[in-house]
Each structure stands twice: as C-alpha cells, then as structure tokens.
C-alpha cells in the first residue's frame, strides 16, 4: 500500500477538484431554477390584483349586505364538507365598493359556536389588505379577498361553528348594516371529532326513538349536580329534539330538573350522523347531600308537540312514560 500512496494522493486531489466543480455547477443550476420560479410561484400570487371583474363563481353563496352604504359583501365561497379540529378553513369574500370609501375600514373575522361570545379563533386586518386597502377603492370595484382560518386542535367537537365577520372604522367602532346589526353570520360548518370522548362512568344501553341510543352517563356533585349523558347516533335524526333530565326523590317528586337541547345547543340532533358519539352535560341546581333514594329520569321530546320519544331497553320492551331511569348515589 505504501508504494501506492503517491498515486492515491494525486487521484484524491484530482477527484476533490472535480467534485467541487460539480458541486458548484449544481448549486449554480439550482439557483438559476429558483430565480426563474420565484416570480411565478411566490411573487405573482402575493402581488396578484385583487380586482375580480368576472361574474361571481357559481359555487359562491350570495350575501348582498351593505355596510355604511359604501361596501357590499356580495358573496363568499368556502368548502361545504365537514371539518375536523386542526383543519384549515379558507373563505373567499367578494366585496364591491358602492362608492369611493371615505376612510380605511378594518375587517374582523371570527369562528365561534352558537354563542358568538365563545370565539375560538379571530383575526383583524385592513379591508383589501396592504396591497389595495379599502380607502383606495373606486366606485364599482369588485374585490376578491381570501381569509384562511386554522381550526384549533383542542376545540370542542363534534359541534356546529359559524364564521362571523364585520367592519370597523379607523377608531375601532363597528360599522352597522341593515337594521343596525354589526355582525354577519355565515355557515354553519359541522366539525366532527377526531377521537372518541372519555368513557362514561356508568354504561347503559337504551334506544331513544329509532335513531338515538343512550350509551352511558357520568354524575358529578359539587356546588351543583352535573349529569353528562353519552348519546350515540344510529342514524340521522329527522329533527331537533330537547333533552330532559329530572332528579326525583324516593317519593317521585321532582327535586331539580333541566331541559334543553343536547350539547348546550351547539350540536342539534338533526345534524347528527351515524356513528357520532355526543357527550351532553346538564347542570341541576342542587347541593350535597343528595336525598336517599334519589333517581335521575332522562329522555327526549319534540319541543313543538312536547311528545316524548319512545324509550326501549335491550330486550325491546318500551319503558313506562318513555323515561330512562338512572341510579345516582346519595
């Protein structure tokens, strides 16, 4: 090997020079490709004209709401499929200037359930962005603007969520539209859970109507009594139902009760899909200790006719008064 050291050294030096040359040529070629792609892939989309002179797409949902007699939201386009926590929801708004705006507006967009105060995501930006802000618009301009919202991975699901938006002036005051309203609601979108909820403490199996099963319940007693019912959808219910939860004593008299839509109204039964598991909490105003022999009576009814859904046990026997009896320890 020693006699070959000279040759090995020469060949290594020559190979190194060749490799360096190839590497430099490769880097130069990649930089040239990058320089050609950047204007089309990055710069052109970022600085594309927001003007939208063509007819609105057929997939857009009409809105036609005018703010401050100056700016009209003509329509919006958004995915119509179900979402999951962590997904991205892109919404494209189509605005029109009814007249040249006298000021620069800000647009706020939020994502929230049926209660708009419980927003889970929110953004504020100039209307039209920095490329073509609203105070530069001319009468008749139709502007396309896309807002992308990322759904939090820890958001409550399943449930219904709305996109709510509005305009504010330069002082932060909301701009009204219509009959003095200042917040526009779009949607809703159904957000389905990625995983099953925690298993209930007590497993049961009762059929409530033809589409719904009661799979279990959990009772928590602190300053009040919270009953979390676990519903399962066997098929899609035909309408919205109301849940009743009654706490009764050994004599059958009602001690406390709560009636309301499942999931605090954030996921009405008419939106349930086969396979959905819905944890449904109801709070009853009562403090410890519970009276001896207390029971829970649970069921569903039609809020219009007040007719209860029939309740059946695992043997197919219909229960008296269409009530599910649940044991609660004192």
Regions found by a protein language model. Give the residues of each.
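Signature aromatic-anchored transmembrane alpha helix within multi-pass, membrane-resident enzymes
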Residues: 16-44
